[in-house]
């Protein structure tokens, strides 16, 4: 099983629409670990995903649409070296 790590920047109407909580649920359901947080610009959510490549890709595909009420304009994906540093998926404070 190929493991992967992706660093995402999701832009649009993605704050105040339960994006972080919804992403946590989707990631956990797919066995993906990492974190998600709002950025202080008010229109970006940042996330780091780690897990089996297929599962990470599923979460990225979900992020392109997001939860009801979100309007995703862009998802920037930066593939990084897998580190295996997370035990679960967390919502972090705004940065």
From Swiss-Prot:
Q: Where is the active site?
A: 20, 38
EC number(s) in its UniProt entry?
3.6.1.7
Kindly state which keywords UniProt assigns to this record, in alphabetical order: Hydrolase
The EC class name is hydrolase
Kindly give the InterPro entries that the UniProt entry links to this protein: Acylphosphatase, Acylphosphatase-like_dom, Acylphosphatase-like_dom_sf, Acylphosphatase_CS
Which reactions fall under this protein's catalytic activity? an acyl phosphate + H2O = a carboxylate + phosphate + H(+)
Recorded GO molecular functions are: acylphosphatase activity
Instruction: Write down the SUPFAM superfamilies for this protein, in alphabetical order.
Output: Acylphosphatase/BLUF domain-like
Domain Acylphosphatase-like: residue ranges = 5-93
Coiled-coil region(s)? none
**What is stated as this protein's family in its record?**
Belongs to the acylphosphatase family.
Query: What protein is this chain from?
Result: Acylphosphatase
Species of the source: Pyrobaculum arsenaticum (strain DSM 13514 / JCM 11321 / PZ6)
Question: Where is the organism placed in the taxonomic lineage, from the top?
Answer: Archaea, Thermoproteota, Thermoprotei, Thermoproteales, Thermoproteaceae
């Amino acid at each position: 099983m190929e493991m992967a790590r992706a660093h995402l920047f999701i832009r649009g109407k993605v704050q105040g629409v339960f994006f972080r909580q919804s992403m946590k649920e989707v990631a956990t359901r797919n066995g993906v670990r990492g974190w998600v947080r709002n950025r202080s610009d008010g229109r970006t959510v940042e996330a780091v995903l780690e897990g089996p490549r297929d599962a990470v890709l599923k979460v990225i595909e979900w992020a392109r649409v997001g939860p009801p009420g979100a309007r995703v304009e862009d998802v920037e994906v930066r593939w990084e070296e897998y580190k295996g540093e997370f035990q679960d998926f967390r919502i972090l404070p705004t940065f």
